[in-house]
């Protein structure tokens, strides 16, 4: 009792208490001010999508704060929950020694188990007097607390790095956009210049159709799927594909504005999607709970689960590549029927006619991959490399290799593919308007609602218009 009292706040030097409190408050204020200034910087640069993503990140930090508070406040109550020994004598992450597992449950062993489960300084008398053991120890709660924090941090880091690397990959397509916009359309341009550019454009379109629909064997569904699967590993997007899909988007949504900056539009939509990807949805937390439940020693759950993000990523990449091939095959069939041979974007190309499913799958893939790496580092620094939870080296190395492969493939292939191919849906995305136009439309809608305008007109403004070219969508250009 004397040792317990000497370790309490009552018998801790005041300078120690003040110093620790000062450090914690200082670090918290620095983090808060840093996020505040980052938000102001994004606002000044009119990066509204990234600013919204930052706000979403703050919400996730607030959720972590609530989880931390709940674990801290309920710690005393949880450690006094007593259960029969048989209830906590199975489904361990590590296999218990046989002699311990089959030992009779005497009152002496119950007390020893209680002392083992509780951290130093706790009294097992509360449960031992009932012939029971604590449900969970304070040490286990503390380690779970750290794991949740590490998981959230790794998820944010992985999502941010994926978006940055994917955005850098998309930025490499800028010269294709510049090439298309520099076509000789102004008055005074020589006829030779017109013919030269038209020939280059024809060559690019011809290359696109020959690549995906040339020859009988390319029209086979099986061959097309196999080719799409392997193409995601090399040259996932070519110049001819970019130009063909860009033309399809312009003809469907911006027919009267051929100089629309499609490349900038893609980057804006990617920034908007980042806000969704950086969050941890309820079903992702449910996935964590299920994994913690099934992480039983001998089941190798961690190893088998590491295949899931890789399999899903390969499926998504192959599907996106197959959509490009399907667009080319559709045009080829139209030519054979003497119809207008133009690429027609459609939601029917995507799973369940919903392009948004692709983003949800990428969200889950990134979270699952960050979960794998976060769990590895948490075990490494908490229990050490030789922990039984870490499993054998033969299981460990493949997991790490697959984690790195998923991160690289998603950043440099799948995410850029997603940014381009999902524009081939029936509707365009919110990012088609620049920040100024978007704010103006939202303000107009809000004023209309406040004035009590008819519901049909407000609904018409809310819906995506079919002629965005009537707005000054390029006002961001200097």
Swiss-Prot record:
Domain notes: The C-terminus contains a calmodulin-binding domain, which binds calmodulin in a calcium-dependent fashion.
Transmembrane segments: 11-31, 61-81, 146-166, 277-297, 298-318, 361-381, 401-421
Protein origin, superkingdom: Eukaryota
Residue numbers spanned by region Calmodulin-binding: 435-456
Name listed for the protein in its UniProt record: MLO-like protein 13
GO molecular function, one term: calmodulin binding
Biological role: May be involved in modulation of pathogen defense and leaf cell death. Activity seems to be regulated by Ca(2+)-dependent calmodulin binding and seems not to require heterotrimeric G proteins.
Classification via InterPro entries: Mlo
Region listing for Disordered, in residue ranges: 449-478
Biased composition (Polar residues): 464-478
Membrane side Extracellular: residue ranges: 1-10, 82-145, 382-400
Keyword Lipid metabolism on entry: no
Cytoplasmic side: 32-60, 167-276, 319-360, 422-478
Basic and acidic residues bias: start-end ranges: 449-462
Pfam families: Mlo (PF03094)
Membrane topology per record: Multi-pass membrane protein
Record family assignment: Belongs to the MLO family.
Keywords: Calmodulin-binding, Membrane, Pathogenesis-related protein, Plant defense, Transmembrane, Transmembrane helix
Localization (cell): Membrane
Organism whose genome encodes this protein: Arabidopsis thaliana
Gene Ontology terms describing biological process: defense response
GO cellular component assignments: membrane
């Amino acid at each position: 009792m004397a040792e317990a009292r000497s370790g309490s706040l009552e018998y801790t030097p005041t300078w120690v208490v003040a110093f620790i409190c000062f450090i914690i408050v200082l670090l918290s204020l620095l983090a808060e001010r840093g996020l505040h200034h980052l938000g102001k910087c994004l606002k000044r640069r009119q990066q509204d999508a990234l600013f919204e993503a930052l706000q979403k990140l703050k919400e996730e930090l607030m959720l972590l704060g609530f989880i931390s508070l709940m674990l801290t406040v309920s710690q005393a109550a949880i450690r006094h929950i007593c259960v029969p020994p048989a209830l906590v004598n199975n489904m361990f992450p590590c296999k218990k020694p046989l002699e311990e597992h089959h030992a009779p449950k005497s009152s002496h062993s119950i007390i020893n188990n209680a002392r083992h489960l509780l951290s130093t300084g706790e009294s097992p008398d509360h449960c031992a007097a009932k012939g029971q053991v604590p449900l969970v120890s304070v040490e286990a709660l503390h380690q779970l607390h750290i794991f949740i924090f590490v998981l959230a941090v790794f998820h944010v880091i992985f999502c941010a790095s994926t978006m940055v690397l994917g955005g850098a990959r998309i930025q490499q397509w800028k010269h294709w956009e510049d090439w298309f916009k520099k076509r000789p359309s102004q008055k005074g341009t020589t006829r030779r210049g017109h013919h030269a550019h038209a020939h280059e454009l024809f060559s690019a379109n011809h290359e696109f159709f020959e690549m995906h629909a040339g020859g009988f064997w390319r029209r086979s569904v099986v061959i097309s799927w196999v080719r799409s699967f392997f193409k995601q590993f090399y040259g996932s997007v070519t110049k001819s594909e970019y130009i063909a899909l860009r033309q399809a988007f312009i003809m469907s949504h911006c027919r009267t504005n051929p100089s629309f900056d499609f490349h900038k539009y893609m980057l804006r939509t990617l920034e908007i999607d980042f806000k969704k990807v950086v969050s941890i949805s309820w079903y992702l937390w449910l996935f964590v709970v299920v994994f913690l439940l099934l992480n039983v020693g001998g089941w190798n759950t961690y190893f088998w689960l590491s295949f899931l993000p890789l399999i899903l990523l390969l499926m998504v990449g192959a599907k996106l590549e197959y959509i490009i091939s399907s667009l080319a095959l559709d045009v080829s069939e139209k030519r054979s029927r003497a119809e207008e041979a133009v690429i027609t974007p459609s939601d029917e190309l995507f799973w369940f006619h919903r392009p948004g499913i692709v983003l949800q799958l990428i969200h889950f893939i990134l979270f699952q991959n960050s979960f794998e790496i976060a769990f590895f580092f948490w075990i490494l620094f908490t229990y050490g490399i030789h922990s039984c939870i870490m499993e054998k080296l033969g299981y460990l190395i493949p997991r790490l290799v697959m984690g790195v492969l998923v991160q690289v493939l998603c950043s440099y292939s799948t995410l850029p593919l997603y940014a381009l191919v999902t524009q081939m849906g029936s509707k365009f995305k919110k990012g088609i308007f620049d920040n100024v136009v978007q704010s103006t439309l939202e303000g107009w809608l809000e004023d209309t609602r406040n004035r009590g305008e008819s519901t049909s007109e407000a609904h018409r403004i809310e819906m995506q218009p079919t002629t965005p070219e009537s707005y000054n969508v390029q006002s961001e250009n200097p």
